[in-house]
């Protein structure tokens, strides 16, 4: 009789553990492959920006630029300073100069390829195991 009670208690404990495991969320989010992954990235990264752009398109611009005429001389002098600075010159250099003088993109891994590798790594792991919204938002 004691063995039956022990067996019944172990089955009840095992059942409770199974129910608890089913109620727990998965360690990763949703499995997203291919287009679904790209759509999730676009929705996560671009959604709020698109909504902001839509809101700004419907607002009258007069509110934002009411005192714009008073600041034109100040802005012109700031623009002249910016054009003369070394930062502006760095931004206007050709890609070959920026990437070390190599003439082809294939020869220079640079930042572009590094971010592409991160995207490919997250894409494959998200497809295979699943990923959360916070992992997807790390690409923004």
UniProtKB/Swiss-Prot annotation:
Disulfide bonds: 33-127, 45-140, 126-131
Tissues where this protein is expressed: Highly abundant expression is detected in neurons within the ventomedial dorsal tegmental nucleus and the laterally central gray alpha of the pons. Also detected at much lower levels within the hippocampus.
Propeptide: 53-116
Pfam families: Insulin
Localization per Swiss-Prot or TrEMBL: Secreted
SUPFAM superfamilies in alphabetical order: Insulin-like
An annotated Gene Ontology molecular function: G protein-coupled receptor binding
Keyword list, A-Z: Cleavage on pair of basic residues, Disulfide bond, Hormone, Secreted, Signal
Subunit structure: Heterodimer of a B chain and an A chain linked by two disulfide bonds.
Xref: PANTHER family: ILGF DOMAIN-CONTAINING PROTEIN, RELAXIN-3
Function of the molecule: May play a role in neuropeptide signaling processes. Ligand for LGR7, relaxin-3 receptor-1 and relaxin-3 receptor-2.
Stated family: Belongs to the insulin family.
Name the UniProt record assigns to this protein: Relaxin-3
Protein source organism: Rattus norvegicus
Lineage: Eukaryota, Metazoa, Chordata, Craniata, Vertebrata
